[in-house]
C-alpha cells in the first residue's frame, strides 16, 4: 500500500510542479494548458468538496438526533454549535490556513522537509490558542444568561459546551494535517478519512442516543468521537510512511521562528473570522425585526441552502490557494496567474448554474424545509438575494484563495474589516430599519455593500498583481523561513 502511495505521490509532484508556461514552450496550445490546469485543480477541489460536505453532514446528523430528544436539547446543541464552536472553529481554521501559504510555496520550491516543520509549528500555535479559548466553553452558561437567553437553555448549553471541549482540541491536529496533505495533492486521503468518520458518526449516534439512551451528553460526545477518528487516520497516514519526503519525524526545529509563524497565523485567522462573523451578525440583526420568527426562519432556510452550495466555492478556495502557492514557490509567476484565471472562471461558471437554478425554482426551493405558507412566501421573496449571494460567493472565496496562496492575509484582513464592518453592516442597518425594508434590506445592504465591494477590491488587486514579483517574494519568504531553523 505504501509503495502505491509513493508512486502516486511522485506522479502528483511531477504533475503539480509542471508549469503552464512550460507546456506552452513545449508547443501545447491553450486548450491543452487549460485541460492540464483543470486536472491539477480538480485533484484538489473534488476531494475537498466531498470532505467538506461530509463534515457538514456530521453536524446536521447530530442536530437531527438532538431534535428527537426534545426542543430544549436541540436548542442547546444548536446554540453551542453555531455560536461557541462556530466562533472557535472559524478562528482556528483561519490560523491553520497559514500553512496553505507556507507549505504550498515550500512544496513548489521542492523544500519538502519544511512541510513537516511548518505543520509542527502550527500544532504548537493552535494548541496554545485552544487553551486560551477554553473560557468560551467553561463560561457558556453565564454568558448566555447575560445575553438574555432563557435559564433552562443557558444551563443545558453550559453542559453541552463542556462536553464539546474534546472536539475543540481535535481542531488543533485536524486543521494542520488537512492542509499538510492538501499541499501535497493528497486530498483523497482526507476524503477517505472523512467518509470513515461519517460512517462511525452515524453508528455511534445510533448507539449512544437510541441504544444506550445517553441523552444530550451522548449526542454531543458522538461528534467529538467522529472528529478524533478522522484525526487519527490522518495522523497515522502522515507520520507512519504516507509522506516520506515531507514528514521526517518530530523536530526541535519546530520550536524556532514561532513568533513570525504566529503573526502570519493570526492574520489568516482574522481574515477568515471577519467573514465568518459577518453572516452571524446578519442573523442576529434579523432576530431584532418585527415578526422576527418568520424573518429568522426564512433567512435560516436561505443560509442553509447557501451553506450547502458554499462547499463548492470553499473547495475552490482551498484548490486555488494550493495551486497559486505551488506555482509561486516554483518561481513561476505566469503559472500562478494562469491557475488563478482557470479557477475563477470555472467557479464562476458553476455559480452561474446555481444562480439560474435558484431564479427558476425561486418559489419551490423552501419546500424541503418548511410547509408554512408564510415562511415559503418569505423565502420566495428572498430568493433573488440568495441567487446573487451564491453568484458573488462563486468568485469571492476563490480570490481569497489567491490571497492565501500569495501570502496577502494581512492586507485582506484590513479589506474585510473595512468592507464588511465599515460599509456592509451600517448599510444593512440603514436599509433594514431606516428604509424599513426588513430582512431584505439588511441582507441586501450587507451583500451589495460588503461582499460585493470586497469582491471588486480583491478583483482589482488580483488583476493588477505583478506575478513575477510575487514569485520573487515567495522565494525570499521560503529562504527566510528556512533560515530560521538553521
Curated annotation (Swiss-Prot):
Q: What do the Gene Ontology cellular component annotations say? A: membrane
Pfam families reported in the protein's UniProt record: MatE
The way this protein sits in the membrane is described as: Multi-pass membrane protein
Membrane spanning stretches: 41-61, 74-94, 124-144, 153-173, 189-209, 216-236, 269-289, 299-319, 349-369, 384-404, 407-427, 439-461
Whether Transmembrane helix counts among this entry's keywords is yes
Please cite one Gene Ontology biological process associated with this protein.
Answer: xenobiotic detoxification by transmembrane export across the plasma membrane
Subcellular location per the Swiss-Prot or TrEMBL entry: Membrane
The cross-references to NCBIfam families, in alphabetical order and at most eight, read: matE
Q: Which family does it belong to?
A: Belongs to the multi antimicrobial extrusion (MATE) (TC 2.A.66.1) family.
Protein name per Swiss-Prot or TrEMBL: Protein DETOXIFICATION 27
User: What is the species listed in this Swiss-Prot or TrEMBL entry?
Assistant: Arabidopsis thaliana (Mouse-ear cress)
| Gene that specifies this protein | DTX27
Amino acid at each position: 500500500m505504501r509503495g502505491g502511495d509513493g508512486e502516486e505521490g511522485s506522479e502528483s509532484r511531477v504533475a503539480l510542479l509542471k508549469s503552464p508556461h512550460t507546456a506552452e514552450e513545449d508547443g501545447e496550445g491553450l486548450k491543452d494548458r487549460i485541460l492540464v490546469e483543470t486536472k491539477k485543480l480538480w485533484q484538489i477541489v473534488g476531494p475537498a468538496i466531498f470532505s467538506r460536505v461530509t463534515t457538514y453532514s456530521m453536524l446536521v446528523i447530530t442536530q437531527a438526533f438532538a431534535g428527537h430528544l426534545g426542543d430544549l436539547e436541540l436548542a442547546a446543541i444548536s446554540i453551542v454549535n453555531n455560536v461557541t464552536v462556530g466562533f472557535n472553529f472559524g478562528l482556528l481554521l483561519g490560523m491553520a490556513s497559514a500553512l496553505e501559504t507556507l507549505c504550498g510555496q515550500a512544496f513548489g520550491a521542492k523544500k519538502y522537509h519544511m512541510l513537516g516543520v511548518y505543520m509542527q509549528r502550527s500544532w504548537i500555535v493552535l494548541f496554545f490558542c485552544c487553551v486560551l479559548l477554553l473560557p468560551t466553553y467553561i463560561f457558556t452558561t453565564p454568558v448566555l444568561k447575560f445575553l438574555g437567553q432563557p435559564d433552562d437553555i443557558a444551563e443545558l448549553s453550559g453542559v453541552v459546551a463542556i462536553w464539546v471541549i474534546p472536539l475543540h482540541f481535535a481542531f488543533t491536529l485536524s486543521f494542520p494535517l488537512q492542509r499538510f496533505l492538501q499541499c501535497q495533492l493528497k486530498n483523497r486521503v482526507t476524503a477517505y478519512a472523512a467518509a470513515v468518520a461519517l460512517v462511525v458518526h452515524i453508528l455511534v449516534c445510533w448507539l449512544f442516543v437510541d441504544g444506550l439512551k445517553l441523552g444530550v451528553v451522548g449526542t454531543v460526545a458522538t461528534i467529538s468521537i467522529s472528529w478524533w477518528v478522522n484525526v487519527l487516520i490522518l495522523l497515522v497516514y502522515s507520520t507512519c510512511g504516507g509522506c516520506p519526503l515531507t514528514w521526517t519525524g518530530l523536530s526541535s526545529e519546530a520550536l524556532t521562528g514561532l513568533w513570525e509563524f504566529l503573526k502570519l497565523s493570526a492574520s489568516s485567522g482574522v481574515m477568515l473570522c471577519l467573514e465568518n462573523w459577518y453572516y452571524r451578525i446578519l442573523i442576529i440583526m434579523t432576530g431584532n425585526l418585527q415578526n422576527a420568527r418568520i424573518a429568522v426562519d426564512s433567512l435560516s432556510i436561505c443560509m442553509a441552502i447557501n451553506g450547502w452550495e458554499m462547499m463548492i466555492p470553499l473547495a475552490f478556495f482551498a484548490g486555488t490557494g494550493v495551486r497559486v502557492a505551488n506555482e509561486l514557490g516554483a518561481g513561476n509567476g505566469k503559472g500562478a496567474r494562469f491557475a488563478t484565471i482557470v479557477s475563477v472562471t470555472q467557479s464562476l461558471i458553476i455559480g452561474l448554474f446555481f444562480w439560474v437554478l435558484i431564479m427558476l425554482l425561486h418559489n419551490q426551493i423552501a419546500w424541503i424545509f418548511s410547509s408554512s405558507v408564510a415562511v415559503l412566501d418569505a423565502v420566495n421573496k428572498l430568493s433573488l438575494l440568495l441567487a446573487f449571494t451564491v453568484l458573488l460567493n462563486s468568485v469571492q472565496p476563490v480570490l481569497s484563495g489567491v490571497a492565501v496562496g500569495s501570502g496577502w492575509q494581512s492586507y485582506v484582513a484590513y479589506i474585510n474589516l473595512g468592507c464588511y464592518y465599515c460599509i456592509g453592516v451600517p448599510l444593512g442597518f440603514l436599509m433594514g430599519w431606516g428604509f424599513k425594508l426588513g430582512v431584505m434590506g439588511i441582507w441586501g445592504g450587507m451583500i451589495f455593500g460588503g461582499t460585493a465591494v470586497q469582491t471588486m477590491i480583491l478583483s482589482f488587486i488580483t488583476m493588477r498583481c505583478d506575478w513575477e514579483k510575487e514569485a520573487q517574494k515567495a522565494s525570499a519568504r521560503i529562504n527566510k523561513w528556512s533560515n530560521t531553523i538553521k
